[in-house]
From Swiss-Prot:
<keyword id="KW-0378">Hydrolase</keyword>
<dbReference type="InterPro" id="IPR027417">
    <property type="entry name" value="P-loop_NTPase"/>
</dbReference>
<feature type="domain" description="Helicase ATP-binding">
    <location>
        <begin position="110"/>
        <end position="262"/>
    </location>
</feature>
<keyword id="KW-0426">Late protein</keyword>
<feature type="binding site">
    <location>
        <begin position="123"/>
        <end position="130"/>
    </location>
    <ligand>
        <name>ATP</name>
    </ligand>
</feature>
<dbReference type="GO" id="GO:0016887">
    <property type="term" value="F:ATP hydrolysis activity"/>
</dbReference>
<dbReference type="InterPro" id="IPR006935">
    <property type="entry name" value="Helicase/UvrB_N"/>
</dbReference>
<dbReference type="InterPro" id="IPR050742">
    <property type="entry name" value="Helicase_Restrict-Modif_Enz"/>
</dbReference>
<keyword id="KW-0547">Nucleotide-binding</keyword>
<dbReference type="GO" id="GO:0005524">
    <property type="term" value="F:ATP binding"/>
</dbReference>
<feature type="short sequence motif" description="DEAH box">
    <location>
        <begin position="215"/>
        <end position="218"/>
    </location>
</feature>
<dbReference type="Pfam" id="PF04851">
    <property type="entry name" value="ResIII"/>
</dbReference>
<dbReference type="InterPro" id="IPR014001">
    <property type="entry name" value="Helicase_ATP-bd"/>
</dbReference>
<protein>
    <recommendedName>
        <fullName>Putative ATP-dependent RNA helicase QP509L</fullName>
        <ecNumber>3.6.4.13</ecNumber>
    </recommendedName>
</protein>
<dbReference type="GO" id="GO:0003724">
    <property type="term" value="F:RNA helicase activity"/>
</dbReference>
<dbReference type="GO" id="GO:0003677">
    <property type="term" value="F:DNA binding"/>
</dbReference>
<keyword id="KW-0067">ATP-binding</keyword>
Length: 509
């Protein structure tokens, strides 16, 4: 049997394959079907969602190239799809890499050498996945397509590529740019595009690229985004992710079919000291009751109810004031002009405006940046993001902030609403490689004691303990939205401790 080895994967004549397998053909296809696991409270249409590791195009059925070994029993003879790739200009440029980054670059480069290769890099948040990928681009010297989930990450890639490889022609591919001129691999060496725009392009657009980099590859599980895999089955694909196997519905297998199992590098030796300030907040009875939809507790609706409590909003403002006074006093004490940054995380967008208005009343002379609002509302996103790199206070939603946003001067987080998932990525916003490890990281975690969501704090404790952060507990209420009575409830150096009155460390060691 003959197959086509092409940019769309391994193509085998549908009728010939069906004839070869006969009555086993249906069972064979079913084995390559992935079904999402049903989760408590999950909508039925999501719980029964199915995706396949193959696609039909004309008379051929296409499989990911990584499944080639499964077809050796068919005595397949591959016919390579002819693709002529140009070579990028070779200019000797050097930029520093940490030892663990250089080791991973060497490993990836070897894996991606011709005729084809796949690599799925698993590297924790803030440890330099982008820089590793740029080093691979420099080594392979092929026209490269970088696919990202958001405009903010696109801008960061453009900035980093321009800084590290200034001799290459780099372009951002988005709707606005494409209306002005056609952006292709003939005119540019590296194109950085947002997946929402790129997935609409025909296969011919992708064919001239010698390398595709998928940033935040774990997010390609959705039915719409997953379709792009059939357009980018090129010779070399590099996937990047901080949480490659973290999907609770089990749909990670879709990406693994195309990229292979994630490969993790050795963790760097840089560590960031920090501590957690856990505030047990007793809210007003009118706002802490769970909100049920279809007889089940709705986390989103319950959080929305919690934030209708004006005292709880004031608590976040008070904690921001407390951190800000620490952050402005310490630089003055040590003779520097760089205040530490505070990120305030909320669950959804409408809360950004609520907290922005509340904070603006208290910080009249301080620039509070909400880059997400500018991006989502069609504002001057480049300006907003540029301002955010020097801002003292940034407001973000969890969903936006967990996606590779890089602000190296940020050292503190206030979790204004409860959170369970993606905590490692959230904490990664203040532990980025190359930032000042001498500054103590501070996490303010508000536990709504009377809410059914209060149990989520134990999932967060697991991540804090993994980081080695001591946990200090204090209390507040709707009658007094000022935290007090701070006691140590977990000490990484004395895990048997129950409570003490130990004082948290100063923001500067």
């Amino acid at each position: 049997m003959e197959a086509i080895l092409s940019f769309a994967g391994i193509g085998i004549n549908y009728k010939k394959l069906q004839s070869k397998l006969q009555h086993d053909f249906g069972r064979f296809l079913k084995a390559l079907t992935i079904t999402a696991r049903a989760l408590p409270g999950q909508p039925k249409h999501i719980a029964i969602r199915q995706e396949t590791a193959f696609t039909l195009q004309g008379e051929y059925i296409y499989f990911p190239i990584l499944l080639r070994k499964q077809f050796e029993m068919f005595n397949i003879v591959y016919t390579a799809h002819p693709v002529s790739l140009r070579t990028l200009p070779c200019v000797e440029t050097e930029f520093p890499l940490f030892n663990y980054q250089q080791e991973m670059v060497d490993k990836i480069h070897k894996k991606l050498l011709p005729p084809y290769g796949r690599f799925y890099l698993h590297l924790n948040t803030g440890l330099g996945k982008t820089r590793i990928a740029i080093s691979i681009i420099q080594k392979l010297l092929y026209p490269t397509l970088v696919i990202v989930p958001t405009k903010a990450i696109q801008i960061q890639w453009i900035d980093e590529l321009t800084l590290l490889l200034p001799h290459l022609r780099v372009a951002a591919y988005n709707n606005a740019a494409c209306k002005k001129k056609d952006i292709t691999s003939k005119e540019y060496d590296v194109i950085v595009g947002i997946i929402n725009t790129l997935r609409k392009k025909p296969e011919a657009f992708f064919e001239p690229f010698g390398l595709v980099v998928l940033d935040e590859a774990h997010e390609l599980h959705s039915p719409e985004n997953y379709k792009i895999f059939w357009k980018i089955q090129l010779s070399r694909i590099l996937g990047l992710s901080a949480t490659p196997l973290d999907r609770p519905d089990g749909m990670d297998k879709i990406i693994i079919h195309h990229l292979g199992q994630p490969q993790r590098t050795v963790s760097p030796t840089t560590t960031f000291s920090g501590y957690v300030r856990e505030i047990e907040y007793q809210g007003h009875p009118d706002f802490v009751k769970p909100v049920c939809i279809n007889e089940k507790v709705s986390a989103i609706a319950t959080i929305d109810k919690l934030l209708q409590d004006p005292s709880r909003i004031q608590l976040v403002v008070n904690e921001t004031k407390r951190l800000y006074s620490l952050h402005t006093a310490e630089p003055q004490k040590w003779g520097t002009n760089e205040p530490y940054g505070i990120i305030i995380f909320v669950e959804f967008r409408k809360l950004l405006e609520i907290f922005y208005q509340a904070l603006s009343k208290e910080f009249k002379d301080v620039e509070i940046i909400v880059p997400e609002v500018a991006l989502l509302c069609g504002g001057v996103s480049n300006t907003a993001l540029s301002q955010a790199h020097s801002a003292s206070i940034i407001l973000l939603t969890y969903g936006y902030g967990r996606r590779g946003i890089s602000f190296k001067h940020m050292t503190s987080i206030i979790m204004a609403t409860p959170r369970r998932n993606n905590m490692e990525q959230i904490l990664g916003r203040i532990t980025r490689q190359g930032s000042d490890e001498k500054k103590v990281r501070i996490v303010v975690d508000i536990k709504d004691t009377l809410s059914p969501l209060s149990s989520q704090v134990y999932d967060r404790h697991r991540i804090y303990k993994k980081k080695g952060y001591p946990i200090f507990k204090c209390s507040a209420s709707y009658q007094q939205p000022y935290s007090s009575n701070e006691v140590l409830i977990w000490d990484p150096y004395n895990e048997s401790c129950l409570a003490s009155t130990t004082t948290p460390p100063s923001p500067s060691k």
